[in-house]
Amino acid sequence: METKVGKQKKRSVDSNDDVSKERRPKRAAACRNFKEKPLRISDKSETVEAKKEQNVVEEIVAIQLTSSLESNDDPRPNRRLTDFVLHNSDGVPQPVEMLELGDIFLEGVVLPLGDDKNEEKGVRFQSFGRVENWNISGYEDGSPGIWISTALADYDCRKPASKYKKIYDYFFEKACACVEVFKSLSKNPDTSLDELLAAVARSMSGSKIFSSGGAIQEFVISQGEFIYNQLAGLDETAKNHETCFVENSVLVSLRDHESSKIHKALSNVALRIDESQLVKSDHLVDGAEAEDVRYAKLIQEEEYRISMERSRNKRSSTTSASNKFYIKINEHEIANDYPLPSYYKNTKEETDELLLFEPGYEVDTRDLPCRTLHNWALYNSDSRMISLEVLPMRPCAEIDVTVFGSGVVAEDDGSGFCLDDSESSTSTQSNVHDGMNIFLSQIKEWMIEFGAEMIFVTLRTDMAWYRLGKPSKQYAPWFETVMKTVRVAISIFNMLMRESRVAKLSYANVIKRLCGLEENDKAYISSKLLDVERYVVVHGQIILQLFEEYPDKDIKRCPFVTGLASKMQDIHHTKWIIKRKKKILQKGKNLNPRAGLAHVVTRMKPMQATTTRLVNRIWGEFYSIYSPEVPSEAIHEVEEEEIEEDEEEDENEEDDIEEEAVEVQKSHTPKKSRGNSEDMEIKWNGEILGETSDGEPLYGRALVGGETVAVGSAVILEVDDPDETPAIYFVEFMFESSDQCKMLHGKLLQRGSETVIGTAANERELFLTNECLTVHLKDIKGTVSLDIRSRPWGHQYRKENLVVDKLDRARAEERKANGLPTEYYCKSLYSPERGGFFSLPRNDIGLGSGFCSSCKIKEEEEERSKTKLNISKTGVFSNGIEYYNGDFVYVLPNYITKDGLKKGTSRRTTLKCGRNVGLKAFVVCQLLDVIVLEESRKASNASFQVKLTRFYRPEDISEEKAYASDIQELYYSHDTYILPPEALQGKCEVRKKNDMPLCREYPILDHIFFCEVFYDSSTGYLKQFPANMKLKFSTIKDETLLREKKGKGVETGTSSGILMKPDEVPKEMRLATLDIFAGCGGLSHGLEKAGVSNTKWAIEYEEPAGHAFKQNHPEATVFVDNCNVILRAIMEKCGDVDDCVSTVEAAELVAKLDENQKSTLPLPGQADFISGGPPCQGFSGMNRFSDGSWSKVQCEMILAFLSFADYFRPKYFLLENVKKFVTYNKGRTFQLTMASLLEIGYQVRFGILEAGTYGVSQPRKRVIIWAASPEEVLPEWPEPMHVFDNPGSKISLPRGLHYDTVRNTKFGAPFRSITVRDTIGDLPLVENGESKINKEYRTTPVSWFQKKIRGNMSVLTDHICKGLNELNLIRCKKIPKRPGADWRDLPDENVTLSNGLVEKLRPLALSKTAKNHNEWKGLYGRLDWQGNLPISITDPQPMGKVGMCFHPEQDRIITVRECARSQGFPDSYEFSGTTKHKHRQIGNAVPPPLAFALGRKLKEALYLKSSLQHQS
């Protein structure tokens, strides 16, 4: 019988089969001669559908119940076994090896072999057998599999029962050892025993059974004979050219090796065994003596297993201090042993490590792959060289060090290599290494192994383990100190080993002996005692860790170790707590561990955020309450759900899945309250105030159980679910019903923890909602103290409000300490369906008049949701819009079945950046008539349909027509349709071309089209309107006045349809704006173009971006400085230093500002609007260093940003960021941001917008947070205008709800999506690496987009691109010029470069990992003329996260100008610095069209407030 590779199916093999046809049997040699009973299953046996875990008694029944079509052809059944136990006839669990001594039986669950996912086919049995033999498979796969055979079938053992796990795990480790030895010897049969043991120890280092690499080596030695027998048995089916294990000297050496440690562990075993009498385990030996020997050996094995288990338990319960703490290396003390600071410089293109491996979040480190790394270097996030020594060798909590690396990665061939200066005579490692250059993610830990003359260093990231080869020449001096320290430790080991008793050598003796070493000794430090001691102490943790891992406990506890540990504690080294849980977690770390030692000044030097005391208190209190025992960086753990790509979602994510309801359900009937069973006296207290609309008397006060309940107060109602917190309701009015019941109508007051701000909310703050209900007064459980809070608004009242709030908090703390009831307050209305917190409608609440605004809203919503005829039955109401004959309307495209020349356009959903191909805009029609169905004409709810005539769009004719035509142009036709009213999606206007607005802005935010051509769909011809054709166009209205609803399904708040020309906006309507984190100015440009903003000040940290901002906004004062310094300077200038929390460094930098800079600083009261986007790199999944301390500090920039809002108190505040901002840090940053703005006193609205729906050709989701003062109107969200398929804009809310900011445009929008060809099709040809800044256009603009984006420019700037290296340029030229072409289209061949090197044309790393990474779609990809551009990133490259960056027809990366156009920047916009700087400025910018859309809505809010003031 043979076993296929790994865990594949097994099959029976006749004795006369030619075994040489198989490469190698993948089974053990042990127990081959147990009698096998072949079973022939009748062909007539039927497959029986099994339910989950049926219980059976007979094995043959279980085999039949778990049969499958795949297994019916197998001569011998193969099944999968889980939750199993091997036991003797008495039911006592037994190790697998005990099969040699007696009968062993099985119990567990049997499943079909190949159906891993369908567990419902499992059949449970209590006892099968007996077991005839066992086998080990998976040698060539590198993953051991255990097979157990009965007389009837073979079983693949997958998962043991929990009670059997410890016993089985030991045997499984033996199988692992066999496979690892097989792998190592197959790759290098001539390896030395030391190398073999080291290689196996490394590969098994993740095992939970063994405490160290030394323990693994001991285990492998102890199993030498077992391993030898398994591998020797493989020789019987090996081919001539394959490794012969029987005579392999290393394997024989392993078999015969004696381990004193094992003998010591087995000293309590009474039997002594003469090894010479032992026989191989693959033969049964007759006779009592042989049986005794076999029995004694198995008993020894079991005793050893038990002793290991006891040892593990003892270690875990009596952990020494050295195992609890890791002493941190002090950088200042070791600085003199390292070179002067220098920076890593990469000369070759490097690939992100994350592209090579499957991310392993919450994965045990033993499951990570092992690779080798050559020509490597280590550095921090500033690219400054850093020693591996500063990173702990154990997983520790509260680590403030971050190390990254680069090098050449290659497959681990299993052979060891010496990192010492002189090559070991036993080392067989080749000096030539093939692989690819990569940069690593954060390095989490590292370890050192040594044996004989060899030293091995291995490090771990979250992706893989890396065995280090030789470092790069640049980094070698940094690694030399680490190697020297290891040599010193080895020298000390040798000293101790030479002593008869290790206790003879004290710490002082060892130091003296080190002083006496010869200068040519590799462990030589100095001849001076003080120098030697200093070196040993400051680098002591490496030495201590090596001693900790040493298997000899006498050496581990020798006087030298205790003396060294004492010395290190005496100099007060910091201790890190060692973490026991080996799970992969991503945490924020300090990217600058050697910043204090550097002589090089860097602008990337971290600085703690400058804050006001209010913002500092809110964030500080939160973390002190919710994370008192959690290390600071644990706050920044990133859950798996947060690893989603911020920018580029999977192209196929939701292609065929219709989205669930995306809007928050508007619940106005809260959970039913539970009545009070107690008898209470309830009576009215006061006179009747009036009547309800039903004539019921209204009262202002009532006595309920002795407590006074008044209109405008708050009461507690208990809900049905006893586990829920009792609900609090605001009393709107009270009345007595017609059946004499005393009633209350109230609105739910929601606790902050039940809103989107969650645990960041103040426990005393309640939020009014529109959820209302009517209850009996007897249902009231009590009253609560509620203050409808109001504070005067403005920066001038800030200090006064702080004093009042401080006293209020002190009073609340005192009441809490004295056990008094909580006093609540309310100052905002929470509306989850509108995504925000709004000022209380104080004039409409607590009136006691019988009116409830929430009931009114509910009635209006119900009315709007109805589809019905108007009174005259000549018009239609649908989704709140009234349609009349002659109106121009939008129709969902899927209702138009006849589609002219464009039938059944297929979507390129499988192609990267082809998400929008095939998606259609709304069909524009004119309503001709409302057809009432005859059978329902007399009914009140008559059924009806609408008759429409269709307009065609250019894209309905052809792609060429769409490209060359105006996006607002329509073609009239005679095609008519009769459709249900549900097909209508809003109203629009169709005008004559001459009646179009003179100033047609980009992006389009108006629902206006023009028509001057007739389209005959029967012939496909376009022609001018016939003279007799009568088309009634839209009536032109005064665009400065309010207009009726213009095509939106639902409109609220400021969505009043106001049309305003930017150049006519009065000066007083433009807000004086401060742009923080301004970048090159994308946000400011869009807001200014909308006519709402006048950017007077900007703060930007990076000089090239600041220069670009100044070029494009010459009237603005631009501060190229740290915003923390600027805020400190402003607060100093205003005399508010006491309210400023900042670093000494910030204060020192403020002192260096000149008087001219200080005189131009903005002051509170001068800025009406603050906008900006705090650096997103820490939040973005696109950022390579997102776990580092600089990103952590950047994330804290949100505190400085919020502090600007607190100190200035502008009318409006706008925060934009990447989508991941909502979920980053488990949502806490998002929640605290909104909690801070609410505490300041703002109204707040939150949402996620897709820039692609506002007229750019790329997917780019942005989180937007609006804040408006209590006196202003919060802007509504701009309506998405372009078709774009990019799902995933929902924000999770409590109670399982989701908020979707705007409607999804996948199924229709007013206009089509902007394509790649629309965007860049007119730009001239350029070559790879083009660097000429100014060029001629050479052609006129063709598409509507090109005309708008080019404007009046006559000179093309920044049409420059990065240069591809020689290999990538060859690859680029080989990529076919067609949609969807990428690296997979490269021929599988080698190319010879100009330097003579031979390289693979297809990237090797992609080929090997494609199966697990969606084929790496898009890498080295060409853009599709009809698709969209990929997300604009700061550094386009073919192997990056966004790898589709090749021009559709030219052999190069897309240019700076092409990237700028993809973001919506006009060609007149200038960028500054190098090509890399310009890409960075564009990639970090807010798309101006999105900013324009936001600005238009802000302007509407300002006009609405103005109109309301005029009305009042």
Curated annotation (Swiss-Prot):
Span of domain SAM-dependent MTase C5-type: 1071-1505
Tissue: Expressed at low levels in vegetative and floral organs.
Subcellular location per the Swiss-Prot or TrEMBL entry: Nucleus
Protein name per Swiss-Prot or TrEMBL: DNA (cytosine-5)-methyltransferase 2
Protein's UniProt keywords contain DNA-binding: yes
Annotated Acidic residues bias: 638-662
GO molecular function, one term: DNA (cytosine-5-)-methyltransferase activity
Residues at the catalytic site: 1176
Region spans: Disordered: 1-35, 634-678
A GO cellular-component term linked to this record: nucleus
Tagged with keyword S-adenosyl-L-methionine: yes
Family from the record: Belongs to the class I-like SAM-binding methyltransferase superfamily. C5-methyltransferase family.
Entry's EC annotation: 2.1.1.37
UniProtKB keywords: Chromatin regulator, DNA-binding, Methyltransferase, Nucleus, Repeat, S-adenosyl-L-methionine, Transferase
EC category: transferase
Task performed by this protein: Maintains chromatin CpG methylation that plays a role in genomic imprinting, regulation of embryogenesis and seed viability. Required for proper patterns of CG DNA methylation in dividing cells.
Compositionally biased residues, Basic and acidic residues: 1-22
BAH domain ranges (all copies): 707-841, 909-1026
Organism: Arabidopsis thaliana
Catalytic activity: a 2'-deoxycytidine in DNA + S-adenosyl-L-methionine = a 5-methyl-2'-deoxycytidine in DNA + S-adenosyl-L-homocysteine + H(+)
